[in-house]
């Protein structure tokens, strides 16, 4: 009998708990969207409590940790970048949240939507890296690139003076 990749992970395992976004990656359909939403909520709270400088340091640490978490969980599941692994979405949306001018609901929604748009669309070179890099770093880097695209759009919106 073949077991599902999800049968090989447990939320009691702290590595799996984090890689699966505290369980948000187990929600169907669209686990990446649910993971991004959970990351947006957590990231907004952390940014509000910690301030930008500490939040950026935490985000960088989460990226480094994520390379391990995602690789270990993918290995345990026997599947590279299984949809339920959403720590990469957390880090991606953290990066975008760090770029918004205020933690107002409109800007938070814009950050979430732009990140999901670029994470799903995967414009060049995101898709290339997503397909070619088979490691924890590879799982993480496509979401960082999607975040960079979203940040570029946010910078443009700020330059043109979007009132939020």
Residue ranges and their predicted role:
Residues 1-4, 102, 109-111:
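Active-site-proximal helix-loop elements at catalytic-domain edges
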Residues 2-36, 68-96, 117-148:
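Interhelical loop and helix-boundary elements at the membrane-water interface
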Residues 18, 33-38, 53-60, 86, ...:
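Hydrophobic alpha-helical transmembrane segments
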Residues 38-51, 95-100, 154:
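Interfacial segments of multi-pass membrane proteins
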Residues 44, 59-68, 97, 111-120, ...:
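Alpha-helical transmembrane segments of multi-pass membrane proteins
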Residues 46-60, 78, 126-138, 162:
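Membrane interface segments of multi-pass transport proteins and intramembrane proteases
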Residues 156-164:
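Juxtamembrane boundary at the C-terminal end of a transmembrane helix
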């Amino acid at each position: 009998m073949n077991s599902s990749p999800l049968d090989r992970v447990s939320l009691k395992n702290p590595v799996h708990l984090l890689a699966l976004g505290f369980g948000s990656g187990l929600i169907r359909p669209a686990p990446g969207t649910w993971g991004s939403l959970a990351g947006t909520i957590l990231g907004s709270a952390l940014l509000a409590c910690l301030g930008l400088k500490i939040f950026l340091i935490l985000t960088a640490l989460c990226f480094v940790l994520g390379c391990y978490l995602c690789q270990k969980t993918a290995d345990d599941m026997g599947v590279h970048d299984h949809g339920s692994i959403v720590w990469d979405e957390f880090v991606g949306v953290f990066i975008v949240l760090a770029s918004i001018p205020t933690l107002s609901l409109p800007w938070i929604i814009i950050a979430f939507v732009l990140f999901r748009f670029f994470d799903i669309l995967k414009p060049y070179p995101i898709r290339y890296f997503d397909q070619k890099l088979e490691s924890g770093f590879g799982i993480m880097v496509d979401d960082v690139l999607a975040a960079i695209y979203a940040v570029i759009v946010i910078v443009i919106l700020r330059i043109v003076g979007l009132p939020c």
